[in-house]
């Protein structure tokens, strides 16, 4: 009876937390749209967006340029930040469970290095319209290489996955640096530099279609996998004892994470540390049960990228910085904190 009451109370607290986070996310959407090099009244932003979404609100006297900035430029950009942040956070949550390692994130498999190589080749060859396709193909190629190397001894393990990702990451980055050193001009180097640091600039409504479909589908699927994630976090032997076919789920999850990350990277470049930070923040809020952790981490990821993008737009007047700079400034100290915490646990 007591356990039922305790469980019911935890469920109520979890639902309350979700409502609060979703409320913060909704407010953040309007605030983020109103902030930028051209400040827009929050009330105008609110009315323009809701009016365009079909709500019977009067916009009032608003210039055409303000309408264009809000609806055609900033709102799609903020929505893409939400989608990318949610997707990267989902990938991080899944990877940390799949390899049972709290410092794993989507890029641990060398996916970012593969995307960088593909994008670099496209830029150097003058195929700038194919940067996204090149990044996607490079990310998929890197993932295939990781899976092949990890399975070379006949049995893929979490350790072999991590080691293979490290090797592929180093190899692909070396190829990228070689290509840049040999064939890049000043314009190409600047394009590559900005792309590899991530940016949501220039987002249009058309850019939202594919990421929305992929991230939405992945969220629905991964939300049903919490029992498998919880078993994996107990270790390989415990998961096998519970009847979990680890090899099947390793291939399935790694492939899905690779495709999801490749789509996101191809859309906005490389935005690091999102998948590392947000699952840990979620654990601090709701514990390690993936039934609660996964949706909370997803919302936190969306919030993180939205506000990192806002900083990239406003910190320098009339200029814009790559969003990856701000995620790295937060993520690098956080990574050190996690590693330091693990070392203290080992000593004790």
What are the roles of these predicted feature ranges?
Residues 1-348:
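Alpha-helical transmembrane segments in inner-membrane proteins
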